[in-house]
């Protein structure tokens, strides 16, 4: 005879009442926060810095991280052999490959261009699957009405839509395009994490509008602590319940585009209040040598989260 969960719990409760002398089990110890580092931290799109992803994995292990987040644009090869070498390199170093950071752009009135980026995102999802990575960072893309990324940053991430179109058009395109990617995400077991990363993801309301519209467990949020340039804490908290990966920015030596004085003890307490269980992945974006700044960042983050 089967026993329902409700009946089991009721019987268990009765047993406790009947035997008051039985001591309650002590609470389980709090889970330790796991820290990863993005390979971007060592490279930063700078040809003078370390691009070799395998060496970045080795450094992550030497510095005491638990995992590594791979930046696709940093990888020099996408062949199966190369992907499996990266996976083995992480395994040998006892590191998780915990995140895959990719780029795509859906803010274009050109339907063929949008479809090209849908196909790209599907391919990227399949690469994440081959690497055994459970979550992949995705973006809305930008309107590309800025001359370059430096100008976009000078304007605090704000840019006008393409002439003749509005953000409302853009939301429809992004929702449609990401919706087309979800079947592959489910098939591959890769949770897409929409990042608060410029474009229509510049605000928490924009990110949540897209995620809530699709209502899929395979589209959640990648939460970047450094992409809300004003009043970040309330904005970060709005996204925390949906977060599957947290990217923690640091800026030792001064930021490449800007510097934020982030209160990590406050951020850690907020994430703990929302019972965030996942990885905190360091994205170092400062001018100091990564070989000194990355370990310094890890030490700071550990202290903040251990005390939360």
Name these PLM-found stretches.
Residues 2-17, 22-36, 41-45, 49-63, ...:
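Histidine-acidic metal/acid-base catalytic patches
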Residues 12-14, 18, 24-29, 89-99, ...:
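Active-site acidic/histidine proton-transfer and metal-coordination neighborhood
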Residues 51-54, 82-85, 114, 118-122, ...:
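Charged helix-capping and loop-helix junction motifs
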Residues 66-67, 96, 134, 191, ...:
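Residue-level detector of anion-binding/catalytic polar loops
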Residues 69, 99-101, 137, 193, ...:
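Conserved beta-strand positions in the central sheet of alpha/beta enzyme cores
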Residues 69-87, 143-147:
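Glycine-rich, proline-tolerant flexible connector loops at the mouths of alpha/beta enzymes
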Residues 72, 104, 140, 250, ...:
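Residues that line or immediately flank small-molecule/substrate-binding pockets and catalytic motifs
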Residues 78-84, 111-114, 291-293:
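Metal-dependent catalytic neighborhoods of phosphoester/phosphodiester hydrolases
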